[in-house]
Amino acid sequence: MRRVVVAGRWDGARPLLPTGVALEEIGQGVLAGCADAEPVLLPFGAGPTFDEAVAASRSQASFVCVPTDVASTREAGERVAAALGESRVVVEGGHNASPDCGLGFLAGLLGVADSEVSGDALPAALTRAEELVAASGTDLVCAASTPRPLLGLDSVLAIDPDLTPIEAQNTALTGLLTQAFAHRPLGRRQLIESSIGHPARGYGSGAGGGVGAIIAASGGRIVPTGALLDDLLTLNKALQSADLLIVAEPELASPLLATSTLDSLTSAAAAHALPVVGCTVRSSLSHVERAEWGLHGVFETETRVTLREAGRRIARTWLR
């Protein structure tokens, strides 16, 4: 049997399919192209795909996703508040189009009106959140699907998701946030995975529109979404004895891939000396960029080739 791991995400790409269904289509194509293939499907990514990826891990933690199109993160905060006391709560978030700086999340977490976490009330609200999380004993984790911080020149308040600079800056708000988040958490029991210091300037603190910063300031942790899924899904174990990794990704373009989980998949494959083929609608990567991202081949559907046919062609090329 030739073991083929089909992993990644297909959110928003054409054909419009849930990631699990898209991976199944590719897997069926692999079987059509290689009769002795054994496809293993592994949803792996942010947003809707994250929900699919952690479906089998819900006994290990509670999971909350912050959609990137919401204007308020309050609902996510309320859901976390309801889950406090459990051993682990994970909040996934990416680069929101309209970041609320996590203030809605903070209000929802505390169960108070939005006005009670804004302006001069913010420092006291952050202190209450830290005390609440500490008393619960919960390991509160932000799965950051964007590396961008909440504050700074490369932050979610300075750059739109499409990488367009945001010219209208609310300097009063950024000043307030800079001061309120300084020297937090007060207990300093938290370590941000890639940075220590100001929690609103660290890696992924802009995730979920600023939810990452609130979690970090409350004594929680920020980890890249890819690293979290790698651990939860025991990615290395899934790749053992595999012959090929096919990674589904809607578009292979360097600016977009900077916020993807592709590097987690290709790094794990490299540890097993596995060939990796990207399956995408379109790619603008040069040969050098493909190599930098750990891709040995790319198949573009260009919306004309079905995913099943893509899987068949990849299998016939790479599983000879």
Question: Where are each of the predicted segments found?
Answer:
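N-terminal loops that bind phosphate or other acidic moieties
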Residues: M1-R320
